[in-house]
Amino acid sequence: MSIFSTRYLVTPFSSFSPPKAFVSKACSLSTGQPLNYSPNISTNIISSSNGIINPIRRSGNYEPTMWNYEYIQSTHNHHVGEKYMKRFNELKAEMKKHLMMMLHEESQELEKLELIDNLQRLGVSYHFKDEIIQILRSIHDQSSSEATSANSLYYTALKFRILRQHGFYISQDILNDFKDEQGHFKQSLCKDTKGLLQLYEASFLSTKSETSTLLESANTFAMSHLKNYLNGGDEENNWMVKLVRHALEVPLHCMMLRVETRWYIDIYENIPNANPLLIELAKLDFNFVQAMHQQELRNLSRWWKKSMLAEKLPFARDRIVEAFQWITGMIFESQENEFCRIMLTKVTAMATVIDDIYDVYGTLDELEIFTHAIQRMEIKAMDELPHYMKLCYLALFNTSSEIAYQVLKEQGINIMPYLTKSWADLSKSYLQEARWYYSGYTPSLDEYMENAWISVGSLVMVVNAFFLVTNPITKEVLEYLFSNKYPDIIRWPATIIRLTDDLATSSNEMKRGDVPKSIQCYMKENGASEEEARKHINLMIKETWKMINTAQHDNSLFCEKFMGCAVNIARTGQTIYQHGDGHGIQNYKIQNRISKLFFEPITISMP
């Protein structure tokens, strides 16, 4: 149902006769006693022996969290400390000096671009933002004096990608030099693996406003020959094989930044002529950021335990670490963003629990009441709610109030109505899907997506992020953000998450009982096979990235920091769903990725 979704498990069997033990346990819900949860039972309204009508619930069969309270509290990174910080500051100063020297060198554009690319992929470019922008501006404003490099596919595609990533206009027409008289890419490029890889990565920076299909043909051409390269085998250049395979799985433009950093640190060490000081800088920075994240996770796990949501609502997923992963995907850097990450993780954890209330536990009547209460967002609305919903509702109210208090204190603006609207829109989308389920209705793909981009859950995360990272918050930008339709920079990233979620989880969810997803909607509407539907959804993802690229340039009212959060959540979603349901169900690849991000420091040898 959402980025936190698994399936609907509420099934209204009319002839089901439950065991007596299940009846007695369900009765506690109507009497207001603590919830005594019974797994693996279907929802049906029945009468107990005392005449009270009680809904029999069904479990999501969720596995316990992999990362419990005791484990999180025990985490510690031993590769941080005074001597590590001293070395890091030395390397950082040296890199700043090197970048400023490069700025004043008119030549060596390729070297400049390669260094900037490596700084980004190694996760340390945020330390050198000003220097990088100055260098790129100089490259953009003057033509290169390196004629041989300028004529290479590798250089041209790298330049195109790096400049576009940083908001500099550069026409795709510069790639026309690599086409023959028939308008096809030259066959002489087929063996230029480095150039093809850069061309492939550059092709994902296309926008919807570009009418030419040049970048699309570049993508097709590069992908085909990169696949041929992998099939041919290249035992001498194992690092290049890994780079190509990695890019074909998830392009760099669509990859969660922090995951890319951890992966690329290991790869970069094996690339010929790798800069050993840059490797050391990246490892030190990764460990410092990881230690900061560990401290935040310890604080969050204490909050989560004190909330008692996992204990009192055992049907819901206990996923505080996974929630934190979403947020570090949005904004990982700098201790000044700690409050933002803490609060957005709370928002994500709340959205997970609320999603499970709609997906797994609540009856349709209860969900109607719950939706109305969320639209009101006031304490007295709790009186209308079933007992098991009260704790969740109050936790939601407190979380929103904490964020609203901070913004009111700092900027004098009451944002509670805006936060309420985002939660109300989310709950209404959940309710719509519940109604579809109970009526057996399969919407068209367009109708499904109009609701599903909201029900995926990222809306509340991005709206809360806006208020936490934007200063000052102007009346103009508020009106734009909360107009009749949310801006594209919120809608399109949510669409990416919804579609990648559906691709990763749809088959299992439909087997276990759920509302139709985008795949099933397309299949029914077009009489298509599942394979054809999946191909269409992948095409939709590709086109949606063009919409995101366009929105990045069109939404000038928003600050750079917020724009980064909005785009990064799309990258995070695509990465989290790369190997399955990265939020709800963890296989080895997903567990290993989270462990490397938060719990396994990189070993560094210090004198």
Curated annotation (Swiss-Prot):
Q: In which pathway does it act?
A: Secondary metabolite biosynthesis; terpenoid biosynthesis
| Reactions this protein catalyses | (2E)-geranyl diphosphate = tricyclene + diphosphate; (2E)-geranyl diphosphate = (1S,4R)-camphene + diphosphate; (2E)-geranyl diphosphate = beta-myrcene + diphosphate; (2E)-geranyl diphosphate = (4S)-limonene + diphosphate
- The protein's superkingdom reads Eukaryota
Q: What is this protein called?
A: (-)-camphene/tricyclene synthase, chloroplastic
Family label: Belongs to the terpene synthase family. Tpsb subfamily.
- Residues annotated to bind Mg(2+) 1: D355, D359
> Which gene carries the instructions for this protein?
TPS3
Motif DDXXD motif per UniProt: ranges: 355-359
Q: Where is the transit peptide?
A: 1-28
Free-text note on domains in this protein's UniProt record: The Asp-Asp-Xaa-Xaa-Asp/Glu (DDXXD/E) motif is important for the catalytic activity, presumably through binding to Mg(2+).
Report the cofactor remark: Binds 3 Mg(2+) or Mn(2+) ions per subunit.
